[in-house]
């Protein structure tokens, strides 16, 4: 038997699932998420192998959906010191790199920056030649300041990356062996957002290297040292560890994508609204052709970026959300007891009224835990408060669902996540509400079943290149990216080609997006 293991880290629990060649679930488990993330992953994996009676020799891949990078950025902890080099003077000097970043995050990544002459027009022609002397001087300053990675961004490098590539060569000459990230490798249109994502990626390399090293050691301790490691990406695809080590920013919101993708795997439905309810938040996203609908931009740790990421609405309403009653007013969330639910929830003998307590008392959910006694809630909380609180919870969810819809027509809603049991089977604006088997493990299942992929977004001017040649170039680059991420050459197909006119640029400009 060939087994794949998927592991996904949430704010409260770390889920693991083992699947066979037919994507059928063999076994699924939960473990507490830990502050360092890694030990929670190891415990979940150890539990899965033991309880599922899994032979290590049968495991062909372990796929991780991890919050290592998101936690590091949000907590400003463990990030590497970065030298940010922008190519685009004098046109881009009005706004410095990292200017609008939160001060503590800018300090955490070092705040070192330089702007040099160079860059390209949207057509790919030079604005001005790259000033190689300025690049070399900047690299020397970075070296003497002890930077641990360099982030290079250039105007319209997604059209012509020539200046970024040459600048990287010069930096390598000055600082041999230093990790270098170029913005054309990271994201798309929009210099500042692309630059931000590139700097965050460079700062995160140190964190991801440490995480991968730790996870490899953990796999070795479980007899899985020869098993390939993959990491789920923000767009619902996956990539090998050596690729993610270079581009860790591609994993920053992957757990959310895993749940949306897992909903598709569990139901076979390609187009739907997915509600993933955990212990702290509910994330509402959209399935489009079996993959998460993508957002145009995403804020990470207070910084605007334009990396590929799922388009979601997140609300502070989940299993651990605290319910507060003041007279006739009932407020649910956003504060949550999180993983302390089984200690602080009234049904478990605690003193905090939570959303789970309300759903238990309402009778819409049952929990197979002898310590959980719904009668405790009924005895301590008036029935009218339970009714009012539950109505408020449902109203909040329905409003969030409405925000992700693009038409007033009723949509299919799929409920997943550990907290999905607390929702009713009828919701306003939904033509059907589905909670599939293994809904609580949809996130790990999404990681386990993800395919290796590559996405490219490039700008072209049809005054300088034919449409067919532009699509061919973008498609070939997407295939190369998929191969770099670990896809077998003979298995790669171009699955999506999107062409968007750019009317704010002259010369019949377009953006072409290709997914392989």
Question: Which role does the model predict for each range below?
Answer:
Residues 1-516:
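N-terminally biased helix-coil "hinge/interface" segments that flank
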